[in-house]
């Protein structure tokens, strides 16, 4: 940006700000936009679960505890249980979005020594963010920890649904199975098989998402007003590029 506008004006581009003001506020925008996508996806999943719950309201199946036959239940009740869980996750995601929707342009160590708070307020309004009430040189990392913990819970709920389908699709049970498109191969060596590939992948992806929660929690503790230990986590990894 400085190179684009010319050498005379370039000295004003970064005036009063630190790199953290820019990077943290940009990260908030990214997470807010990601939240909007996730909220929309959860709403679509809720609609599908509700539809299946009503469709199979009277579809009887055997309930199990410890993996052993217990008492009769219905597929509708199973889908209703998943619906209730994802509805809680929708509320969690909305709360996490609100908590991460903050920006900070408070300068070195967060004192506004070289930047008017009115600038922070103006920029945050333009970006759809709320000024961080009390910042240091960074936006407090407990906000990010709560956000990624929420993603971990949602991933676990999706794995919960996927695991149920995987168990139901076993040959010995075969009470339900995931969608199998025309021409889809179950196995290169055993084409007669209909493997639960989608739900197995969801199970693996859930583990990956949960792995991001612990580093986010570790980042809550920083030295004084700022250190860069958190950048190892918040910066994109080569695998993300």
What are these regions (language model features)?
Residues 1-106, 112, 116-122, 131, ...:
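A helix-coil-helix interface module used to build multimeric assemblies
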Residues 134-135:
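A structural signal for small-residue-enriched, beta-sheet-centric alpha/beta enzyme cores
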Residues 177-183:
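Short, surface-exposed loop/turn microsegments at beta-strand edges and helix-strand junctions
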Residues 144-166, 184-232:
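A conserved active-site cap/scaffold subdomain adjacent to cofactor or substrate pockets
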Residues 8, 52-59, 126-130, 168, ...:
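A short secondary-structure junction motif
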Residues 233-240:
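Conserved small/polar residues in nucleotide/adenosyl-binding loops
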């Amino acid at each position: 940006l400085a190179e684009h506008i010319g050498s005379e004006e370039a000295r004003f581009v970064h005036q009063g700000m630190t790199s953290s003001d820019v990077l943290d506020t940009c990260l908030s925008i990214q997470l807010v936009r990601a939240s909007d996508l996730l909220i929309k996806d959860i709403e679509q999943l809720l609609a599908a679960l509700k539809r299946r719950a009503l469709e199979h309201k009277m579809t009887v199946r055997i309930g199990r505890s410890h993996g052993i036959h217990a008492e009769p239940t219905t597929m509708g009740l199973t889908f209703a249980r998943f619906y209730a869980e994802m509805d809680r996750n929708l509320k969690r995601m909305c709360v996490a979005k609100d908590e991460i929707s903050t920006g900070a342009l408070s300068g070195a160590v967060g004192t506004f020594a070289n930047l008017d708070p009115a600038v922070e307020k103006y920029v945050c309004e333009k970006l759809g963010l709320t000024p961080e009430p009390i910042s240091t040189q960074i936006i407090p990392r407990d906000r990010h920890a709560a956000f990624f913990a929420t993603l971990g819970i949602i991933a676990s709920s999706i794995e919960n649904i996927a695991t149920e389908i995987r168990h139901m699709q076993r040959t010995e049970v075969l009470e339900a199975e995931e969608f199998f498109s025309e021409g889809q191969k179950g196995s290169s060596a055993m084409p007669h098989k209909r493997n639960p590939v989608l739900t197995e992948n969801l199970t693996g992806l859930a583990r990956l998402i949960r792995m991001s929660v612990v580093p986010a929690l570790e980042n809550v503790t920083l030295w004084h007003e700022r250190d860069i230990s958190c950048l190892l986590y918040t910066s994109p990894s080569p695998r993300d590029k």
